[in-house]
């Protein structure tokens, strides 16, 4: 007789282990796609490219975000994606309380003494090393033009 004896215990054990392995592989597959960093970068570029002060928001489907002057990174359980900005550099407004306030709508004159002080804070923010931070809402982009300072804040 040619073939595997189906009544052998080791055949049943092997089939059982293979079934458990397949279920385990299926359970670890991501249930959602990786976040779309390109769409977020497009929102930033649209705001940065305009000639007038503007504000834009983009919903995020990520758990963590990393914003740099020239790139954005998003990650969730399904993976990590990155995208470069076409218009930059932009100013990550995550480490400075004053820049975050202006990003969220405060007039720049309420947080900074002059346009030069705003530009200095922007330069300092762009020098920092981007870090992964938890996402706590939509991506906000605000282009501010005030007293000779032209800066695009992202947070």
Where are these regions (language model features)?
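Acidic, polar-rich N-terminal leader regions of halophilic archaeal proteins
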Residues: 2-155
């Amino acid at each position: 007789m040619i073939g595997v004896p189906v009544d052998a215990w080791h055949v049943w054990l092997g089939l059982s282990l293979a079934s458990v392995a397949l279920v385990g592989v299926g359970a670890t597959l991501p249930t959602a796609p990786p976040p779309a960093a390109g769409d977020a970068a497009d929102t930033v570029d649209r705001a940065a490219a305009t000639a007038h002060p503007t504000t834009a928001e983009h919903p995020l489907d990520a758990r963590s975000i990393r914003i740099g002057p020239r790139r954005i990174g998003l990650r969730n359980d399904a993976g990590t994606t990155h995208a470069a900005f076409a218009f930059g550099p932009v100013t990550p407004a995550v480490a400075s309380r004053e820049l975050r306030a202006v990003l969220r709508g405060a007039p720049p004159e309420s947080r900074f003494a002059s346009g030069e002080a705003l530009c200095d804070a922007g330069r300092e923010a762009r020098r920092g090393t981007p870090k992964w931070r938890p996402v706590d809402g939509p991506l906000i982009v605000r282009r501010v033009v005030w007293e000779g300072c032209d800066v695009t804040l992202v947070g």
